[in-house]
C-alpha cells in the first residue's frame, strides 16, 4: 500500500514544473525586461536629448539672490 502512494507522488513530481514557479518566472522575466528597457531608454535620452532649461526666475527672486551675493542691483 505504501508503494502505491510513493509511485503516485513520483508520477506527479515528474509531470512538470510547479505552476506557481512558472508564474513567478514569467513575472520576474517581465520585471527584468522592464528595468533593462528603462535603463536603455534613459541612456539614449542622456545622449540624444538636450538638457532641460531652468525655469526663469522672477525679478524679486533675482534681486534677492543678487543682494545675497553683494552685487548692487541696477535701478536701486
Swiss-Prot record:
Q: What is its main location?
A: nucleus
InterPro entries in the record: S1FA_DNA-bd
- The annotated region (Disordered) lies at 51-76
Q: Motif Nuclear localization signal: list the residue ranges.
A: 50-55
Classify the source by domain of life. Answer: Eukaryota
What keywords does the record list, in alphabetical order? DNA-binding, Nucleus, Repressor, Transcription, Transcription regulation
Tell me where it resides: Nucleus
Gene Ontology MF terms: DNA binding
- Where composition is biased (Basic residues), the residues are 51-66
Q: One biological process GO term for this chain?
A: regulation of DNA-templated transcription
Query: Do you know which Pfam families this protein is assigned to?
Result: S1FA
Q: What does this protein do?
A: DNA-binding protein that specifically recognizes a negative element (S1F) within the RPS1 promoter.
> What family name appears in the similarity comment?
Belongs to the S1FA transcription factor family.
The molecule here is called: DNA-binding protein S1FA2
**Species:** Arabidopsis thaliana
- Name of encoding gene: S1FA2
Amino acid at each position: 500500500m505504501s508503494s502505491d502512494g510513493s509511485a503516485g507522488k513520483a508520477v506527479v513530481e515528474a509531470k512538470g514544473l510547479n505552476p506557481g514557479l512558472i508564474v513567478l518566472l514569467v513575472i520576474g522575466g517581465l520585471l527584468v525586461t522592464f528595468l533593462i528597457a528603462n535603463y536603455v531608454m534613459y541612456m539614449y535620452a542622456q545622449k540624444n536629448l538636450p538638457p532641460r532649461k531652468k525655469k526663469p526666475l522672477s525679478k524679486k527672486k533675482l534681486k534677492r539672490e543678487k543682494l545675497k551675493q553683494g552685487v548692487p542691483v541696477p535701478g536701486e
